UniProtKB/Swiss-Prot annotation:
This is Spermidine export protein MdtI. It is found in: Cell inner membrane. The keyword Membrane applies. Catalyzes the excretion of spermidine. GO terms for biological process: glycine betaine transport. The keyword Translocase does not apply. GO terms for cellular component: plasma membrane. It is a multi-pass membrane protein. It comes from the Bacteria. The chain crosses the membrane at residues 6-26, 36-56, 64-84, 88-108. Pfam families: Multi_Drug_Res (PF00893). Keywords: Cell inner membrane, Cell membrane, Membrane, Transmembrane, Transmembrane helix, Transport.
Amino acid sequence: MQQFEWVHGAWLALAIILEIAANVLLKFSDGFRRKCYGILSLAAVLAAFSALSQAVKGIDLSVAYALWGGFGIAATLAAGWVLFGQRLNPKGWVGVVLLLVGMIMIKLA
């Protein structure tokens, strides 16, 4: 396992934020009917992958990708709730809990 450096953690945090932004912008694009939001969404995805590529220079790929995807899903869920009034049913909440437990287990491994 590589030694953790804060700069790589910062790159990972930026990648997560950009992924969330990309997902929210994609929703705002209304299926790319609103092209400006669609283009911004694509730019955010490219920037997120660029930041992730910097993060994996100092964080194991398996850990970085799991955290990126997991936190991205959880935060996008929260954004959907706050911005769009979207709600999960009980099965969805079980999935979120399993996701978070899995992320913790990967980080501890």
